[in-house]
Amino acid sequence: MNTADDLANPLERLGGSVERVTFHSEASGFCVLRVKVRGQRDLYTVIGSAASVKPGEYVECHGSWINDRAHGLQFKAPQLKVVQP
């Protein structure tokens, strides 16, 4: 069943290669990644949670775009997993 929030902010999919791990907390899993998406020139900032993530790995994310006042456009991914490309 869809709620009003689900309809206002449907989850999008973003997948790509991790170019840089800007921040990763081993305690909470929270991470800030710079991701290269195929066919796109610029790197995207992805924030989410992952047990372990390294540059060169491929991540698949489900979330939504946010515009953070301090950090700009980011893809906030409650669902982030490392997968085989």
Protein language model features and the residues they cover:
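Long, highly charged, low-complexity intrinsically disordered interaction regions
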Residues: 22-85
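Short boundary/loop segments of OB/S1/cold-shock single-stranded nucleic-acid-binding domains
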Residues: 1-13
